[in-house]
Amino acid sequence: MSAESPEPASAEEQKEMEDKVISPEKAEEAKLKARYPHLGQKPGGSDFLRKRLQKGQKYFDSGDYNMAKAKMKNKQLPTAAPDKTEVTGDHIPTPQDLPQRKPSLVASKLAG
């Protein structure tokens, strides 16, 4: 019963084996990096683009501009106190509670 069992490979040996076995994705990535070396650089763009990005975007389109303008206008306007303090829905109106209708100036075609 003294069969030799394979020893587990050390971490260094496993790392070397992984480096030798290249996945198809890694091979394709290496091929593309060789073909397009400038794409591997960090995105930065031109100085103009960098300055615009630092400033921050004010408005995307005229709709954003108008919404921001309306929001600023709403903040500046004072809120008016409501004239009516009456709360609707407290009671069920009856014919006696309702105000009288004003007579119409135009005669109805239905009244004959």
From Swiss-Prot:
<comment type="function">
    <text>Protein phosphatase inhibitor that specifically inhibits protein phosphatase 2A (PP2A) during mitosis. Inhibition of PP2A is enhanced when ARPP19 is phosphorylated. When phosphorylated at Ser-62 during mitosis, specifically interacts with PPP2R2D (PR55-delta) and inhibits its activity, leading to inactivation of PP2A, an essential condition to keep cyclin-B1-CDK1 activity high during M phase.</text>
</comment>
<keyword id="KW-0132">Cell division</keyword>
<keyword id="KW-0963">Cytoplasm</keyword>
<feature type="modified residue" description="N-acetylserine">
    <location>
        <position position="2"/>
    </location>
</feature>
<keyword id="KW-0498">Mitosis</keyword>
<dbReference type="GO" id="GO:0015459">
    <property type="term" value="F:potassium channel regulator activity"/>
</dbReference>
<dbReference type="GO" id="GO:0005737">
    <property type="term" value="C:cytoplasm"/>
</dbReference>
<feature type="modified residue" description="Phosphoserine; by GWL">
    <location>
        <position position="62"/>
    </location>
</feature>
<dbReference type="GO" id="GO:0045722">
    <property type="term" value="P:positive regulation of gluconeogenesis"/>
</dbReference>
<feature type="compositionally biased region" description="Basic and acidic residues">
    <location>
        <begin position="12"/>
        <end position="32"/>
    </location>
</feature>
<feature type="compositionally biased region" description="Low complexity">
    <location>
        <begin position="1"/>
        <end position="11"/>
    </location>
</feature>
<comment type="subunit">
    <text>Interacts (when phosphorylated at Ser-62) with PPP2R2D.</text>
</comment>
<dbReference type="GO" id="GO:0051721">
    <property type="term" value="F:protein phosphatase 2A binding"/>
</dbReference>
<dbReference type="GO" id="GO:0005102">
    <property type="term" value="F:signaling receptor binding"/>
</dbReference>
<dbReference type="GO" id="GO:0051301">
    <property type="term" value="P:cell division"/>
</dbReference>
<keyword id="KW-0131">Cell cycle</keyword>
<dbReference type="GO" id="GO:0019212">
    <property type="term" value="F:phosphatase inhibitor activity"/>
</dbReference>
<feature type="region of interest" description="Disordered">
    <location>
        <begin position="73"/>
        <end position="112"/>
    </location>
</feature>
<dbReference type="GO" id="GO:0004864">
    <property type="term" value="F:protein phosphatase inhibitor activity"/>
</dbReference>
<feature type="modified residue" description="Phosphoserine; by PKA">
    <location>
        <position position="104"/>
    </location>
</feature>
<dbReference type="GO" id="GO:0000278">
    <property type="term" value="P:mitotic cell cycle"/>
</dbReference>
<keyword id="KW-0597">Phosphoprotein</keyword>
<dbReference type="GO" id="GO:0000086">
    <property type="term" value="P:G2/M transition of mitotic cell cycle"/>
</dbReference>
<feature type="modified residue" description="Phosphoserine; by GWL">
    <location>
        <position position="104"/>
    </location>
</feature>
<comment type="similarity">
    <text>Belongs to the endosulfine family.</text>
</comment>
<feature type="region of interest" description="Disordered">
    <location>
        <begin position="1"/>
        <end position="48"/>
    </location>
</feature>
<keyword id="KW-0650">Protein phosphatase inhibitor</keyword>
<keyword id="KW-0007">Acetylation</keyword>
<dbReference type="Pfam" id="PF04667">
    <property type="entry name" value="Endosulfine"/>
</dbReference>
<protein>
    <recommendedName>
        <fullName>cAMP-regulated phosphoprotein 19</fullName>
    </recommendedName>
</protein>
<dbReference type="GO" id="GO:0019888">
    <property type="term" value="F:protein phosphatase regulator activity"/>
</dbReference>
<dbReference type="InterPro" id="IPR006760">
    <property type="entry name" value="Endosulphine"/>
</dbReference>
